[in-house]
Amino acid sequence: MTDPKTKSIYTVNKDGSTVTYTSAKNVKGTSLTIPSQIKLNGVTYKVTSIASNACKNKKNLKTVTISRNVTRIGSKAFYGCKKLTRVTLGKNVTSIGNSAFENCTSLKKVTIPSKVSKIGNRAFYNCSRLTSVTIQTKKLTSKKVGSKAFTRAGKQNYKKLVIKVPKGKRSAYRTLLKKKGVSSKASIK
């Protein structure tokens, strides 16, 4: 289904009351907001996920805001959005798919919300200008963070990469993040 206002495409999920943001084919602007709900054909749906490849290689996209109802970001959802500098993840996101933000080479700052329990392989791979990562979740383990999730993140200047983690998780997350590709030169606080 296509939203007539934004031209964004949504797919109704099996439950019939929620939708997945499927495509930004007609989005030409620099800013994108994934809404918490949309009204299509007179029916209001909650937007609960972003499909794989939904915004892949959108060359002009600079900022993305993901609403509170979204729980899942699909694989390669924002892959290769090279001008993307800022992403605001909704507080209810639980899963960030494989390569979701891979090669977003202008991304500078990201906050991983407290409900995230899974970060896929290469999720932030080659986000080379990343300087600030705030991890609010206490749920991450080696099995729930994919291979190379943070490899080459902040590679422009590893010494400027600051990763803030929850109190009581500094030691465990330092070990975990280094196994998943964070440079030993990055600061984990």
Predicted regions, residues:
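Structural signature of tandem-repeat unit edges
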Residues: 9-16, 27-49, 59-72, 82-95, ...
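N-terminal low-complexity, Pro/Thr/Ser-rich intrinsically disordered segments
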Residues: 1-10
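Conserved functional micro-motifs across diverse proteins
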Residues: 20-22
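A structural signal for leucine-rich repeat
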Residues: 125, 146-154, 175-180
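Consensus positions within tandem repeat domains that build extended binding/scaffold surfaces
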Residues: 51-53, 74-79, 97-102, 120-125, ...
